[in-house]
Amino acid sequence: VTAAPAATAATAATPATAALNFAATAATPATPATPALIFAATAATAATPATAALNFAATAATPATAATPALIFAAAAATAATPATAALNFAATAATPATAATPALIFAATAATAATPATPAFHFAATAATPATAATPALIFAATAATAATPATPAFHFAATAATPATAATPALIFAATAATAATPATAALNFAATAATPATAATPALIFAATAATAATPATAALNFAATAATAATPATAACNFAATAATPATAATPALIFAATAATAATPATAACNFAATAATPATAATPALIFAATAATAATPATAALNFAATAATPATAATPALIFAATAATAATPATAALNFAATAATPATAATPALIFAATAATAATPATAALNFAATAATAATPATPAFNFAATAATPATAATPALIFAATAATAATPATAALNFAATAATPATAATPALIFAATAATAATPATAALHFAATAATAATPATAALNFAATAATPATAATPALIFAATAATAATPATAAFNFAATAATAATPATAALNFAATAATPATAATPALIFAATAATAATPATAALNFAATAATPATAATPALIFAATAATAATPATPAFHFAATAATPATAATPALIFAATAATAATPATAALNFAATAATAATPATAALNFAATAATPATAATPALIFAATAATAATPATAALNFAATAATPATAATPALIFAATAATAATPATAAFNFAATAATAATPATAATPALIFAATAATAATPATPATPALIFAATAATAATPATPALNFAATAATAATTAARG
């Protein structure tokens, strides 16, 4: 099987080729089976002690656990036979002759060979820690430079597990991590929360999404992405938290406009913790208090650095029993099971009493002996107590609804204690609303949920897309990340964050959707309250793809209802093939040429605001060589005849005007548009402006191989696209597996029907040619790209 989904141009001539996406392990001859773990990749070779730029969940494979699990969200591949092969693209497979079915790895890839020492230009976690580039680890989303003292130090990303000899089988948890034991105090260099600040490597943790590396020696060092603080004595107020920004002082003009967090509270500025999405008020006593992102644990004296949990840390101290600073899940481990609940977006601290505890995914239960089924669910759980039966204690908005603190929800990433006094106080964070008797129908929607009431026609404070388009307000696309619940009384009200608006009494089926569900009632046919995908399949459209991470619920009644969720486009009869793009979708209809109220970066490119590019997370304007080429996902351009420059790209719109040629203040990638191609390449999180001059250009983001002159338009991968070559016409359904690729080895040829995994989709066969509105895994099987191979 060709490794089409990867398209890697790693030749000996281009040593830096391996711009691996979401992980890359420098498979050395010594460790042929190195787990190119997804959401975790380890590449620590003896030669490069700091090499362990683990991505999203590295596991320090000890000799005891040789059979490292080809983890989902991970996959092992690199064999000695194909040293540089795996330039995997969010799902690439380094198909070697020995392992034909090598796991079409998702979110990771292994490649670096001894021949190319600087190879791992890892994306979202790469560290080229060579002696020559000491300051290398500009790690993204993780990366800790293991010190000589702890060569195998689990600088886990999104779930490091401090594998101690006692727990050899320690779960290499993903999206969660278990705190290191007293034996390894600084071990937990967890990403999304921890800092492995050891005396030896003071500036080490260039942690992303949480990590402060403020050392006196390197004042401006931590230009961390998504969470860095360069808190030096010279810049006391430097905590330029994004999503919580701090007033830049004249002394530090270039203060890191940190994204999604960063606090560096120095003694001079005790309250500076303008933390993003989970800040902790630094007290004078703890000047360097962990500017934890998406979680923060108050390490107790007994376990100094222990609970550096990622995405679920709980500083369960006996003094603060109710402490649940739960993030995306997090169970407050009880005294009986001190380190147990290192839940991974689902982990369950299965105590002897509850052996069968549901190892919920995207929902975790912190089953303690006292409360066996306590459902502190992640991403959807409701802690329905007898007192409050419908109390959506959603994670991403979990509320520890105790009788004493009914309104408790100091929810992280969501939570509003809507009291009767402030009925419309929808300060929802990522969704939740503590429904009070007064507002019974408050849909504590998660990642979606719109509840446009008749009273407030424009109230559509949509979350990431959803629009509860009622017949009265057809074009109500008041997108979130820009949503405004403009009511006469509280015009600026909705300080909505990734959140949602509560549905009205008219729709009793209060779509408390969790990442998908839509309670499509007959009364509201177009109620596309899609949650990260779900489509309310009406009788008329029985086969509607209930896509995950993308879904279109367009009914004939509301043709322009494009309440896309993270992309979905309501395919109208006129545009049957409209790409229900994920993370990028344009619903530009002829009637509303400027319609694209894009989420996460929409730019209303009007003649008046030519330089508008509020680029987010990427955006590159391709050169004249490939004018209309990359209509990549994560950045679709809805260029209609009426608005040729309408590229209101999602997650990366660029309004490249001749005046601002170098415009793209690109984030997470983006190549600067040239004057020749005004709005063209709205690349998706990985667009590469493959010009003959910059053949090696790979500004790869989340995927994207730098198309060389030989294959100009080739690798337009979508989070896991597989370029099904003509060689395998029989496998049209090539598993563009997403978030779970199965590595069917030659040993098990009996499992050809690779699971059409969730968070993935297999490209439909010839019977349904246009079918694959694949989510997070579009297969680019075109006849033109037969040569597309890894």
From Swiss-Prot:
In this entry the propeptide is located at 1-5
For this entry, the protein name equals Ice-structuring glycoprotein
Tell me if Glycoprotein is a UniProt keyword of this record.
yes
Q: Which GO terms describe its cellular component?
A: extracellular region
Post-translational modification here is noted as: O-glycosylated; contains disaccharide galactose-N-acetylgalactosamine attached to threonines in AFGP8 and AFGP7.
Entry remark concerning the domains of this protein: Contains 44 copies of AFGP8 and two copies of AFGP7.
Upper taxonomic classification of the species?
Eukaryota, Metazoa, Chordata, Craniata, Vertebrata
List the gene name. Answer: afgp8
Purpose of the protein: Antifreeze proteins lower the blood freezing point.
User: What keywords were assigned to this record?
Assistant: Antifreeze protein, Glycoprotein, Repeat, Secreted
**Which ranges of the sequence are coiled-coil?**
none
User: Which body tissues produce this protein?
Assistant: Synthesized by the liver and secreted into the blood from which they become distributed to almost the entire extracellular space.
Tell where it localizes. Secreted
Main site of residence?
A: secreted
